[in-house]
From Swiss-Prot:
Mg(2+) binds at D205, E231, E257. It comes from Pectobacterium atrosepticum (strain SCRI 1043 / ATCC BAA-672) (Erwinia carotovora subsp. atroseptica). One of its GO terms (molecular function) is magnesium ion binding. Coiled coil: none annotated. This is D-galactonate dehydratase family member ECA0189. The keyword Magnesium applies. D-arabinonate binds at H207, E257, R278, H307, E334. SMART domains: MR_MLE. Has no detectable activity with D-mannonate and with a panel of 70 other acid sugars (in vitro), in spite of the conservation of the residues that are expected to be important for catalytic activity and cofactor binding. May have evolved a divergent function. Pfam families: MR_MLE_C, MR_MLE_N. Keywords: Magnesium, Metal-binding. GO terms for biological process: amino acid catabolic process.
Length: 399
């Protein structure tokens, strides 16, 4: 096979709607171009610098066909590795290389991986409101669209900030009360089950807002409402506590969106301390490690629910679909509808049909970027308020 030489690499940051989105574009001597998602929206320009200043000089002139070798070279070339900036940069290139390989083979990625395990992957979306009535409206809107798995949040991630017992002059931040959050969320589960019964599966994201002892209490109390899963009940640094939760509650646990390093998930999977791994594909380094993670999890009965928030390009979301269609232990896929300008920049973006995401049949990833449209929406950086999370006394806490 003749080599496919990398002739240029671009890294484009665009903000068509609320979020800064990072896309890597790899050009080759065969006039085949690949696209990848490298979005780390809190630090987009750091990722761009990594691609432009370090990965591009390393890769120009090399054969794009050798994805495995190039992935390892990109990962170890800086010596220090497995952080969010380098992983996202590597992932953007890695996805683009897989996109090129699929286009050269005239195959969609899931065929290149080995074919499909299912007809479609069930999707879930987010219903959130500050009031129960508002939450009911959101639930019914999503149910009417065909969703039978709905993530429900009352007061988003922390209850009612207006009801906090605050200090005299609170430091700036996004405040929440853990006890109030637990009480409100358990009341939400009870109300949803009383109103809707088992018409749909309820998912919920704790977003690592609890102390370990509170997480144990919450997992025990919420079990009676049969959630599909409870997400990120603890921050990664406290995951040793998952064994305590596991021994006292049968509630399904999901975690992984903050993981960057294989050491963060290996013991959790081997010891079966979680039911679902939901890593963010670009945060772990792209398609190449995601395929290996999927196979590793299958050996231990752990299922996959890839992270797919709004601050992610439709290219990255399409990669998730290909992984889900192929990997036997894929369970469900998070999805949030794209705003209008995002669809202009990514015109091939895929949406669910009646609660399912179906295989993409175009060669490669099957979703690209309109570069002219993207350049109409330059990067706009702002400090992120929601990641400045504080307890009522002003103490910083994991967001």
């Amino acid at each position: 096979m003749l080599p496919t030489i990398i002739t240029d690499i671009e890294c484009l940051v665009t903000r068509p709607d609320r979020h800064n989105l990072v896309t890597v574009v790899v050009h080759t001597n065969k006039n085949v171009t690949g696209y990848g998602c490298a979005t780390f929206q809190q630090r987009p320009l750091a990722v761009k610098a990594m691609v432009d200043e370090y990965l591009k000089p390393l890769l120009l002139g090399r054969d794009a066909n050798h994805i495995e070798d190039l992935w390892h070279m990109m990962m170890v070339n800086a010596y220090w590795r497995n952080g969010p900036v380098i992983n996202n940069a590597v992932a953007g290139v890695d996805m683009a290389l897989w996109d090129i390989k699929g286009k050269l083979a005239d195959m969609p990625l899931y065929h290149l991986f080995g074919g499909k395990s299912r007809d479609a992957i069930a999707a879930y979306s987010h219903a959130a409101s500050d009031t129960l009535d508002g939450l009911y409206q959101e639930v019914e809107r999503l149910y009417a669209q065909g969703y039978r798995h709905i993530r429900c949040q009352l007061g988003f991630y922390g209850g009612n900030p207006d009801a906090l017992h605050s200090t005299r002059q609170p430091t700036e931040g996004a405040y929440y009360d853990q006890d109030q959050y637990m009480a409100n969320t358990l009341a939400m589960f009870r109300a949803l089950r009383e109103k809707y019964g088992d018409r749909f599966h309820i998912l919920h994201d704790v977003h690592e807002r609890l102390f370990p002892n509170q997480a144990v209490q919450f997992a025990k109390a919420v079990e009676v409402y049969r959630p599909y899963f409870i997400e990120d009940i603890l921050p990664p640094a406290q995951n040793e506590w998952l064994a305590q939760i596991r021994s006292q509650s049968a509630v399904p646990l999901a975690t992984g969106e903050l993981f960057n390093n294989p050491a963060e998930w290996q013991n959790l999977v081997i010891n079966r301390q979680v039911d679902f791994i939901r890593c963010h594909v670009s945060q772990i380094g792209g398609i190449t490690p995601a395929l290996k993670l999927g196979a590793f999890c299958q050996n231990f009965g752990v299922r996959l629910a890839w992270h797919c928030p709004p601050d992610m390009t439709p290219i990255g979301a399409a990669v998730n679909i290909h992984l889900n269609i192929h990997l036997h232990n894929a369970a469900i896929q998070e999805f949030v509808a794209y705003p209008e300008n995002t669809r202009k920049v990514f015109p091939q973006a895929v949406e669910p049909e009646n609660g399912y995401l179906y295989p993409i049949e175009r060669p490669g990833i099957g979703v690209g970027i309109d570069l002219d449209a993207a350049r109409q929406f330059p990067v706009v950086y702002r400090p992120h308020e929601w990641t400045q999370s504080r307890l009522p006394d002003g103490t910083m806490h994991t967001p």
